[in-house]
Amino acid sequence: METIDHKICRLVRYYVRMVGSRDPVAIAKFAGIGIATMPLSNVAGYYTLVQRKRWICINEDIPSDSPLFKVVVAHELGHALLHRKENCAFIRKHTLLLTSGIEREANQFAAELLIPDDMLQEYSGCTSDQFCACTGYPKELIDIRTKYM
């Protein structure tokens, strides 16, 4: 039986190959998942299924060109592809700590999607703090990615 780690890697490889990009917004569009921005108070984003249509909702306070936007979309995309029938919120102050199985899997999906092997190679001589300063990604994301290599 396939482990969840292998399933996540396989899903990421499939969508990157089909879309030709690691952009979570482009992958969501390809997969028929809508993305909407709206006021969400202290929630950075959430995934929901409404009348068989999958939606990723992102806090309108997060600039669409920011690394945080990519991280939140990638995390929620992980939920959409791995946990289709679950409604999942990503708290703005969330530190990517492994709070539950489905959150760990969504975090792992985001890390695998946004930090490919060639990026790890490019930054191999850097500390995780330097990596984060260069990419804008949270430290927890690189920690998750290197844990599941």
Residue spans of the language-model regions?
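Active-site hotspot residues in diverse enzymes, especially metal/ion-binding acidic/histidine motifs
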Residues: 1-149
